[in-house]
Amino acid sequence: MSGLRTLGEFIVEKQADFPHASGDLSSLLASIRLAAKIVNREINAAGLGDITGAVGTENVQGEDQQKLDVYANDKFKAALEARDQVCGVASEEEDEAVAFNKELNQNAKYVVLMDPLDGSSNIDVNVSVGTIFSIYRRVSPIGTPPTEEDFLQPGHKQVAAGYVIYGSSTMLVYTTGNGVNGFTYDPSIGSFCLSHENMMIPEDGKIYSINEGNYIRFPQGVKKYIKYCQENVPEDGRPYTSRYIGSLVADFHRNLLKGGIYLYPSTQSHPQGKLRLLYECNPMAFLIEQAGGLASDGVNRIMDLKPTELHQRVPFFVGSKNMVNKVEEFLELNREED
């Protein structure tokens, strides 16, 4: 037990590397840690209480809100507001950004964007789900309510990002721009403990993750990349293995550990893609680049995109560097056919 480093201890250690740090970001991360524990407890008991299934309402994207979506959203909002380090949040479950109105919150330096429960439709069948978060330093004046500009910042302005995966074990993975570290929740002591230090994704992988049920609607470049993945070329390590869970956090986490690529391209029904730039793609892009991988919309680096609206969608290709480069090649060569 003496060799364990908890998330709290790790954050304090890293803060010591920056003598002029105020500790606000450390406190903010502690709020996320607390909310993750509460949500984890509820997910673990989801089959025993009236917490699964749909609420009967839709979010701004037109998706059915699950009971756990609403629960997780409320818990993360409450935890972030209570610590006074956050002036406002944007969430998949909220039509507009939420400003915290207490004076202490308006004096806060940070805004948080989040998907409180990614993959929540999988809860009823006991498949891994997750929370995704992204932290920015506000651009509006301290002491005033947050503005839309605080949230519509490109991904390269992020100061921290991460996710929590609620699976066979619960893990919190995050970066502040100095590498990626993972912490596994130990329920016996109620703490996240460092289990995966300085996580790096292999430059090549053997896994591709995409919903092939939409194959007929994919751009030609993506169709040809899938065929490339399936070709029998043993000297090149192909065919690759197809693995798709349907939960971004779960698919991303596996590929981060093992090497691979996650693809959610544009389709005929979703020409702008389906994943949200601000609270799904940007945080995952920050993590993957810190781990040695790449994230792209098929043409541009994800973190260079300038957001124009809160719930903006983009095509998303993320994972091992060489695999993302390869799918970009296929998209470029076949763009005129689409």
Swiss-Prot record:
Family in the record: Belongs to the FBPase class 1 family.
Protein residues bound to Mg(2+) 2: D115, D118, E280
Name of the protein this chain belongs to: Fructose-1,6-bisphosphatase class 1
Name of the coding gene: fbp
Ranges that cross the membrane: none
Catalytic activity: beta-D-fructose 1,6-bisphosphate + H2O = beta-D-fructose 6-phosphate + phosphate
Record-linked NCBIfam families: PRK09293.1-1 (NF006778), PRK09293.1-3 (NF006779)
Cofactor note: Binds 2 magnesium ions per subunit.
InterPro entries given in the database record: FBPase_C_dom, FBPase_class-1, FBPase_N, FBPtase, Fructose_bisphosphatase_AS
Record's subunit section: Homotetramer.
Organism annotation: Vibrio campbellii (strain ATCC BAA-1116)
Residues engaged in binding substrate: D118, G119, S120, S121, N211, Y244, Y262, L263, Y264, K274
Cofactor(s) in the UniProt record: Mg(2+)
Enzyme class: hydrolase
Swiss-Prot/TrEMBL keywords: Carbohydrate metabolism, Cytoplasm, Hydrolase, Magnesium, Metal-binding
MF term (GO), any: fructose 1,6-bisphosphate 1-phosphatase activity
E.C. number: 3.1.3.11
Pathway: Carbohydrate biosynthesis; gluconeogenesis
